[in-house]
Curated annotation (Swiss-Prot):
The gene is rplW. One of its GO terms (cellular component) is ribosome. Keywords: Ribonucleoprotein, Ribosomal protein, RNA-binding, rRNA-binding. Belongs to the universal ribosomal protein uL23 family. One of its GO terms (molecular function) is structural constituent of ribosome. This is Large ribosomal subunit protein uL23. It comes from Pelotomaculum thermopropionicum (strain DSM 13744 / JCM 10971 / SI).
Amino acid sequence: MKDPRDILRKPVVTEKSTSLLQDNKYTFIVDPRANKTEIKEAVEKIFKVKVEKVNTMRVKGRIKRVRNIPGKTPDYKKAIVKLRQGDKIELFEGM
């Protein structure tokens, strides 16, 4: 099994992800090769909480251009993790 810190890359802080905090849902960018079971175990191990549900999605990178040179931001995988009632992740508190 992979190290949990390799599975969870970073939290996502956007207007939409902040509104999901009211429903006890937290959003992370995760390793694209990780499956839902690995993501669940990583969140439970790192933050010491119980996970009810994990939704994942692959996000395509955007087309960018610097002067006349076209490029693309990398694709990534995003996970929305729903925690058990009463559990919280302190990292997201105060947002």
